[in-house]
């Protein structure tokens, strides 16, 4: 189907890739269908969580494990149950990113990750019951530290 | 809002599958136990509101090219 996207204009998406968020996500409870878009570089930790029913709604998201190497949590029972998760191999985890005017202050939400069961394309945002992770975790320092390949077009380093 | 008075160890039942029990009362603090189906999401309200606000902020994202914009920071 043709999908209007916030950042990529009108694109053709495979309907079987649509992820159902039964309860939406907090703040956008009525919008329930999303797709994950890559901008062509699978090595980059960034993706877009694009809403299907409202083209103007798209979140920048990251694969948190590519940014925070020791990020670790147990998937809450409520997610295992409502997403019907059978194997950890089917699970995709994304952190929603806030990109302010000053991009150096970009943060990711480690406290409330988006969990997707890629087997049945069901997703939800969960809230971790821990004080270990913050809703506003600064990204730039992490990226610098980890030397993550963000696809920033930097010269390839010699191994 | 419906207001009920409960003592320690007393419960209320909602919709025949959610049980809320007053576990302990110490001055200003009340400990509450909740028995509910696993698929029900339960949040501390202030945290839920914080997540909502954060998501709304995230949705205000302008048309950025993260790759380009991050270049300068990761040299």
Swiss-Prot record, chain A:
InterPro entries: Flagellar_assembly_factor_FliW, Flagellar_assmbl_FliW_dom_sf
Keywords: Bacterial flagellum biogenesis, Chaperone, Cytoplasm, Translation regulation
UniProt-annotated location(s): Cytoplasm
Pfam families: FliW
GO cellular component: cytoplasm
Quaternary structure, from the entry: Interacts with translational regulator CsrA and flagellin(s).
PANTHER family the UniProt entry points to: FLAGELLAR ASSEMBLY FACTOR FLIW (PTHR39190:SF1)
Name of the protein: Flagellar assembly factor FliW
Organism: Acetivibrio thermocellus (strain ATCC 27405 / DSM 1237 / JCM 9322 / NBRC 103400 / NCIMB 10682 / NRRL B-4536 / VPI 7372)
UniProt gene name: fliW
């Amino acid at each position: 189907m043709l999908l209007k996207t916030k950042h990529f204009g009108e694109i053709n998406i495979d309907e079987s890739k649509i992820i159902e968020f039964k309860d939406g996500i907090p703040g956008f409870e009525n919008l329930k269908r999303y797709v994950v878009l890559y901008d062509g570089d699978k090595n980059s930790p960034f993706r877009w969580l694009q809403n299907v029913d409202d083209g103007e709604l798209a979140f920048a998201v990251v694969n948190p494990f590519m940014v925070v190497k020791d990020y670790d949590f147990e998937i809450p029972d409520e997610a295992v149950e409502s997403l019907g998760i059978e194997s950890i191999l089917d699970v995709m985890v994304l952190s929603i990113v806030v990109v302010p005017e000053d991009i150096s202050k970009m943060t990711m939400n480690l406290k409330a990750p988006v969990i997707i069961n890629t087997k049945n394309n069901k997703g939800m945002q969960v809230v971790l019951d821990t004080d270990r992770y913050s809703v506003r975790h600064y990204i730039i320092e992490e990226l610098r530290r980890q030397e993550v390949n963000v696809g920033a077009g930097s010269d390839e380093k010699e191994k | 809002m419906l207001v009920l008075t409960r003592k320690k160890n007393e419960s209320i039942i909602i919709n025949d599958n959610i049980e809320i029990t007053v576990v302990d009362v110490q001055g200003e603090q009340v400990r509450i136990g909740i028995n509910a189906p696993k698929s029900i999401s339960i949040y501390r309200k202030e945290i839920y509101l914080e997540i909502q606000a954060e998501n709304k902020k995230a949705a205000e994202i302008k048309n950025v090219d993260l790759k380009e914009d991050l270049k300068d920071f990761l040299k």
